[in-house]
């Protein structure tokens, strides 16, 4: 079964006047936590073959942590993965991506709430609340998605 990692970005800077939401970076604490979480994912054997992320800075930085931990893989930014992204569009895209995926393929998506929670529900009909630096692990088998694990930073950090 192919695997999909749906990852929420790490801890971002607070909202502040004059800074666009899309420009908010990870905090120093967010960097440390996110590095540890991504190392933990890879340590569990969840090493992506390809990755997709929101173009928002905090998502780009979170994906950079995973990219480094995994030793590199092809990356692509998508405006469909922003907080206002449409889960319906993402579902169609993911179904196409996984239609002929080899059973050992692992793809990672780094995005935001509420988009990720809505996407998990759309794919699996299960509710999950992805906090910062959380990862929903989904398996794709015979056209169906299954939520097999919800990993929190405490589950993945040393």
PLM regions: where:
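Secondary-structure boundary motif
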Residues: 43, 68, 96-103, 140
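Short, flexible active-site-adjacent loop segments at beta-strand->alpha-helix junctions, enriched
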Residues: 10-11, 57, 81, 113-115, ...
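Domain-level recognition of soluble alpha/beta enzyme cores
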Residues: 124-157
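Internal catalytic or translocation cores that form aromatic/hydrophobic pockets or channels
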Residues: 80, 85-107
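Non-DNA-binding regulatory cores of transcription-related proteins
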Residues: 97-133
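Active-site-proximal alpha-helix that buttresses catalytic centers in soluble enzyme cores
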Residues: 2-81, 85-88, 129-130
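Generic structural signal for well-ordered alpha-helical scaffold segments
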Residues: 35-42, 91-99, 120
């Amino acid at each position: 079964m192919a695997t999909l990692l749906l990852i929420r970005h790490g801890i971002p800077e607070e909202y502040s006047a004059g800074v666009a939401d899309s420009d908010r970076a990870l905090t120093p604490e967010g960097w440390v936590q996110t590095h540890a979480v991504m190392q933990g994912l890879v340590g569990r054997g969840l090493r992506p073959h390809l990755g997709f992320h929101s173009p928002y800075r905090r998502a780009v930085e979170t994906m950079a942590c995973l990219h480094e931990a995994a030793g590199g893989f092809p990356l692509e930014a998508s405006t469909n993965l922003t907080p206002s992204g449409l889960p319906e569009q993402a579902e169609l895209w993911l179904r196409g991506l996984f239609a002929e995926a080899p059973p050992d393929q692992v793809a990672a998506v780094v995005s935001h709430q509420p988009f990720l929670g809505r996407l998990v529900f759309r794919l699996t009909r299960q509710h999950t609340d992805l906090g910062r630096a959380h990862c929903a692990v989904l398996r794709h088998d015979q056209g169906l998605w299954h939520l097999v694990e919800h990993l929190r930073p405490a589950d993945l950090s040393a």
